[in-house]
């Protein structure tokens, strides 16, 4: 038992050292990037940017992402109910989850976060 504990600690130590080494290695400025850094940008067609260009996610995209995560969670919970054999034991907690999800969706529609026409 002690052997496995020492082996696990040794593995963790080696993993941590490799992780720290790579973190320092990738963050070193070796003079390669000291000049113009625009060639590293996402515009590889010769476009030289004179200012910082950032891509921001739109709020609509973020809301769509949240909807996807919540409804994916709902589907994964509901599809597993018959397979778990606990359909009637946890039915009210699943029903509460669906009601809470529906109320949240109605609040978002009411406040205008969800627009069906673009």
Curated annotation (Swiss-Prot):
Q: A GO molecular function for this record?
A: NADH dehydrogenase (ubiquinone) activity
Task: Tell me the compartments it is located in.
Answer: Mitochondrion membrane
Q: Which UniProt keywords apply?
A: Electron transport, Membrane, Mitochondrion, NAD, Respiratory chain, Translocase, Transmembrane, Transmembrane helix, Transport, Ubiquinone
Asked whether the keyword Thylakoid is assigned, the reply is no
Q: What class of enzyme is it?
A: translocase
Pfam families according to UniProt = Oxidored_q4
Whether Translocase counts among this entry's keywords is: yes
TM regions (residue ranges): 1-21, 59-79, 86-106
- One cellular component (GO) term of this entry: mitochondrial membrane
The reaction(s) catalysed by this protein are: a ubiquinone + NADH + 5 H(+)(in) = a ubiquinol + NAD(+) + 4 H(+)(out)
Its placement in the membrane is given as:
Multi-pass membrane protein
Superkingdom as given in the UniProt entry: Eukaryota
The family database entries (InterPro entries) matched by this protein are listed as: NADH_UbQ/plastoQ_OxRdtase_su3, NDAH_ubi_oxred_su3_sf
Q: What is its EC number?
A: 7.1.1.2
Tell me, in one coarse class, where this protein mainly resides: mitochondrion
Q: Function, please?
A: Core subunit of the mitochondrial membrane respiratory chain NADH dehydrogenase (Complex I) that is believed to belong to the minimal assembly required for catalysis. Complex I functions in the transfer of electrons from NADH to the respiratory chain. The immediate electron acceptor for the enzyme is believed to be ubiquinone.
Provide the family line: Belongs to the complex I subunit 3 family.
Q: By what name is this protein known?
A: NADH-ubiquinone oxidoreductase chain 3
Q: Which organism is it from?
A: Fasciola hepatica (Liver fluke)
């Amino acid at each position: 038992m002690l052997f496995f504990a020492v082996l696990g600690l040794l593995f963790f130590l080696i993993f941590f050292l490799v992780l720290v080494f790579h973190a320092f290695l990738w963050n070193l400025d070796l003079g390669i990037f000291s000049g113009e850094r625009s060639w590293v940008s996402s515009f590889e067609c010769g476009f030289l940017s004179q200012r910082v260009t950032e891509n921001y996610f739109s709020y609509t995209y973020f809301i769509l992402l949240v909807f996807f995560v919540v409804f994916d969670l709902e589907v994964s919970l509901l599809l597993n109910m018959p397979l778990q054999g606990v359909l009637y034991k946890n039915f009210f907690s699943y029903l509460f989850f669906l009601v809470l999800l529906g109320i949240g969706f109605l609040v978002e529609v009411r406040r205008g976060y969800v627009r069906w026409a673009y």
